[in-house]
Amino acid sequence: MIRELDWKELKYFAKPQKPTKVKKGKKGETDDKPLELIGQERAAEALEFGLQIKAQGYHIYVCGATGTGRTTFAREYAKAKAATEAVPPDLCYVYNFKNPKCPKLLRLPAGMGKRLKEDMNELIVRLSEELPRTFADKTYEQKKNEIIKVLKTKQDEIIKEMSVEARKHDFEVKNSNSGIFFVPIIEGETITEEQFESLSSEQKEIITKKSESIQQRASEALREIKDYEKTTKKEVDELDFALGLFTVGHHMNDIIETFADEPELLEYLKAVKEDILDNLVDFVSEEAEEEESIQAFMPWYNKKSNEDNLTKYKINLLTDNSELTGAPVVVDYNPSYPNLVGEVEYDNEFGNLSTDFMKIKPGLLHKANGGYLILQAQDILGSPHAWETLRRTLITEKIITEPLREYTTGVAVSGVKPEPIPVDIKIIIIGGGYYYDVLYTYDDYFEKLFKIRVDFDYEMKMNDQNIAELAKFIARNTSEANPFAPCAVASIIEYATRIAERKDRLTTRFNRLAEILTEAVVWANMDKSDKVLSKHVKKAIEKRDYRLNMYEEKLSEMLEEDSIMVSTEGEKIGQINGLAVLDTGDHVFAKPSRITATAYMGKAGIVNIEKEADMSGSIHDKGVQVMIGYLGQTYAKDFPLSLSSRICFEQNYNGIDGDSASSTELYAVLSALAEIPIRQDIAITGSMNQHGEIQPIGGATYKVEGFFDLCKTRGLTGNQGVIIPTRNIRDLVLKDEVIEAVKQKKFHIYPIAHIDEGFPILMNLPAGEFPYPADTVHGKVFRKLRSYHRKVMKE
């Protein structure tokens, strides 16, 4: 008995209902659960579990289709968990007085880094103001001059003694910027260099010997002067230190007292205090004007101001967590190498590159340290060296900030080398299954680092709870100025089943639904309607399809013009209408295709012309082999098959794969064998196994609509229709015009569960049971194959 689907079986008919208003709370939340998490119970459980584990290697990969709210899902759950956790410490880099090229890391309680930075900046300002005043005091100048006066007196005494000694040896002492030297005296007067050269050799020799004697005494005198200078400098330094200690100690002690509970910080502050006292000149130097005058005529001169010297006392606050109330949650879409681990910036002044610890800039790993970093798989795999850098960080548990050139080549680049930062972070990567498979297959560390996989479902069950949640979603994403009527809500629910491609499922790709909500509001406004009605939702869907279906329309034109030959009336032997689904990325549709078969006596078996031309995939080739198995199982238990048959997808130039046409091809082969014509106003789709059972296929809705559109274009006769697998009935979510045509008996949809059920529809003959009567399809095929075998045996 031929079964035909009733129009009520062709989609889910939603009941009109009002969008459910939600209580205003945190963004994205309803009365009971965040809207983006509807239907994601498995994912929620997996993510909650992953967030609880703090052990190394338990990072998270959220896997699912785009548009299902994966990022929002991960962010909201991470925020909820982060809110219960401690605020991580501030990260600061400070000057390393023992090794200036390697800035020192300070980890301080949240908020303390900001205060330290402010206190140190204030210290620099105050000392820059007070120390010059202190050292400009008259009392200080008097004490300093007294010390210097003693030195001057000693210098004068030593030089005077040297002058007397030199006179005894006929020399006069001369003092210059380059030091002390002696000029010979002849006949009571000093001589010039030219006069010395004009002297005889004997005179020169006498003067030279005298000079050697006096030079020895001069060396002793110079040593005495230097000793006095050292003593004087020490006394001046002690004076400066004592004076500076009062001013510096006053301010530094306040800072030290503030941070008395931080031993590591106290050690740094002690080093700061010692360095300031050793370099008081940096606060009171008067060399700035001189350097500015030099730079006026030598622009390339690298002026180093007092401010540059004082930079070493500043604090480079990498992360300021003073405003946080829990652990940080960072979401980013540009995880480049420098954005991940930070970078060291350089100043370029006339080709002279310079840097210091204050030019170390934080990256995402710094900002998210102690919390959660959410990245997109596509972004991190598409950015050079980003994945390798993230992997290294997770393996070593350290953030290493170094120039990219140094990381990639191993060649050291001159500059600062910051102390690595211990990392305590949970990485959440958002991506599709493809990227997960790539990482799992080609990176040995991936499964060791990302042990939690969160599978995000693209659909949810059709039940009252999920329908209610979907109604809340509609309310959440629409305004009171453009309310959705109950009929419009029903249309959105029906559209959700169409995206899911099942009557008993609702899509979780809420971005697709949100787009239709937005566009439906626009159509309602253009219609000057105070409410969004069902017709506005349907128009939004229709117009969206229209914007995307140009390629589909071009193929439809070719079918209408018979450039692509597909018959929709009459009967033909060895010719049948198949259906293929095409996906252009943002639009899916089906194209009817003519499949032909020839059959004749021989031993070649069934030859797939597409395979011979290297235009078929392995799954399609498997379908052909399944068909051969069916023929042998059904007809050749008592004799071998003596058959040659060729099957072909006509006008196929792009290749083909999949087994959804295996039953279609079988009908064409059997038609050619038994010479039974096939109705051309029927198209068929369905996979099969070797026992003739019809298996479900994908895209059933689009395939039915594809053949319907062709028949509608050529004119509906009332006899046209499509055969689909029985197991695909639940997948049908057809357009209203198809449903209306079925309702009016202008178009027909026949479900079948076995090959035998299709014969009465396609060939107007029963299948027949063994021993296969002559007036059945099996009987005609069986007799033809047996006659082939007998003829072959006679040969």
Named regions from a protein language model:
Residues 356-365, 371-384, 388-390, 396, ...:
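Peripheral, non-AAA+ core regions of ATP-driven protein-machinery
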